[in-house]
Structure formats: C-alpha cells, structure tokens
C-alpha cells in the first residue's frame, strides 16, 4: 500500500507567500511515516467528520468516532442505517479530524473500503471488539459498547479501508 501525504503551507508561523497551497508532497507506505504532530490527532478522542456520497449523489457529512488499526481506517455503522448502504454503493470516503484546541491544525484522510466485516458472520467478534475499544476511547467507560438500540437486535458492520491520500495542515 502506498499513498501520498500532502502538507499544506499554513499560517502557524505567520503569513507567508503561497499560504494554504500544498507545500511538500511525499510518498508513504505506512502511517508510521506521518509527522507525529498529525499522528497524535488519530490517537486522541477527536470526533471526525466522515464524508460519503448519499443516495441522491450529494455529499453526506457525519460526525462520528474515528478509529484505525495499523495502516487501515476503520469505519463502523449499524447495519440498518442508510449510511451503510451508501458506503456499499460508493466505497470512497474522507475523514477529517480537526484539533479542537486549534482549528488551524487538521488531517484529512481519503480512504476506500477494502473489506466489509459483519458482526453476525464468522469473524464478527472482531467487529464487536472494535466497537468496545472505540467506546472506551471516546467515553472512558469499560466495555461493552453502551449505545446499542435496545428496541431492535442491532448488528454492526465494520468497513476496513485502505488509505489513498492524506492532507495535513497547521501545528498544534
């Protein structure tokens, strides 16, 4: 897997010529190559804005919890939600994580579904463990995940995504 990291010129050090244009571009094959000032945004409990294409062909933006493992982005959703079908129809997504302490410090990750895991199928316990892990990351509460709809037998889907491109901006 290889992707491009595009570092935008920013105003953290004051005004500069060509600010807000892409400065350095580099090829990368792992998130380990990401500058730590952006990598930390992935590890903090920052709510991402997930961009997908809805059934009407327009972008749909959803605030949701962010997770990744190794060099894959993990996107979970309940199987009955429209978002699940929209992702199946168009597996390309974009995640935006903005530093809540400085909105001029962010990372954008474009990614595409590589595989879909279903909680109710063999291997589905991984989906449940991921949901429990992200629950603890964002709430500080121990498992199990505490937001399942009690009125239905809610089952979850996990989209495991490969990274296509990353854009970064600013400093903490």
Predicted segments — roles?
Residues 1-33, 105-172:
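Charged, gly/pro-rich active-site loop segments
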Residues 20-52:
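Short, conserved active-site entrance elements at the starts or edges of catalytic domains
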Residues 41-44, 103, 155:
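A short, polar/charged loop/turn motif at coil->beta-strand junctions and beta-hairpin connectors
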Residues 42-43, 88-89, 152:
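Alpha-helix boundary recognition
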Residues 45-79, 85-87, 94-98, 106-109:
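Short beta-strand segments
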Residues 99-100, 163:
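Short secondary-structure boundary segments
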Residues 39, 65, 85, 149-151:
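Short secondary-structure boundary/capping segments
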